[in-house]
Amino acid sequence: MAVTVDLDTDCAQLVLDVGALTLGEKNRKKMKSHHLRKRENENISQAVCTLLNSGGGVIKVQIENEDHNLTRDGLGLDLEASLFQCLPFVNWHLDITEDGGYVYIFVKSWSLDFFGLLIATLRTNLYTRSMSSSVEVNAAAALEFLQDLKETGGRSCVGPELPAQRVCPGVEEESHVEDLATPVFNKTQFQHQEDFPFSRSTFVEATLLSGKQLQKRIKELIPRHLSAFANTDGGYLFIGLDGNEQQIIGFEAERSDLEHLESEIDKCIQQLPVTHFCEEQEKIKYTCKFIPVHRPGAVCSYVCTPRVERFCCDVFSAEPNSWHVEDSCVKRFTTEEWVKSMMDD
């Protein structure tokens, strides 16, 4: 069940209905459906976030298991953890009661003075590269990133020039890794189990996928890694490289499959939410290559390599996980709405 506004309540406060949930640690551990358990946790987190952004209110939870007693059984540790997602000090902002087959969670309004931010957010979905990882930044760091972009009117799509001389001779710099990756990207073919001369870095991500999981995993990897590269200084995602052995393996695919895969990658990139603080309002610039991997006598697999350029402003992997009530409906902030709400003076 989706989180909905209870329009039939006699309560003077805003009431959100999350439907029937299994409550209590023992009963939640017995739940057979992992998907249902995950969905219930997501609904609780979403409801708390929504009320924090809507002046506070009440979450109405129907108790699925009739023998539940709040004092004896509690909510369940996983549901409690879901309450923590928005609220580090739960007891200061929530009160929980049980009455007539329902649990009611009373949520106070969000406070700028207390939290230092204008709205509550479960996930920003804003990634940057940090050394060799794509890292999602928290709301406070996202605000700082956005404020910097606003002050400068965006940023140049060309990264800052690095010193010609290395500070520590013999130490491999991040920029040197990019220099090693570029010739590999420019190749027209590889030999199976050929070595490649670089590791993961700020500019490079390498991963090995099988043909069976290829399309699903690419849809998961593209938004996170390419948005992170775009928000940093650009970079390469090599799909088909064994990072542990530093060998080129590739993934098995028919030639006819590559066109469909390229179309899916393009769709993923075009759907990435962006906001602008610059006049140019440019689109995400990228190049995608499929490079054949040869065994003696035949092509046996392919390496897929999207390369994305540094972006002028900010790229999100998805709309931020933040909700509010509008026109008696629970609505997710669009990226533009979220950015405006975070930065509203």
Q: What do the PLM-derived regions correspond to, one by one?
A:
Residues 1-345:
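Conserved N-terminal catalytic/coupling substructures associated with nucleotide/phosphate chemistry
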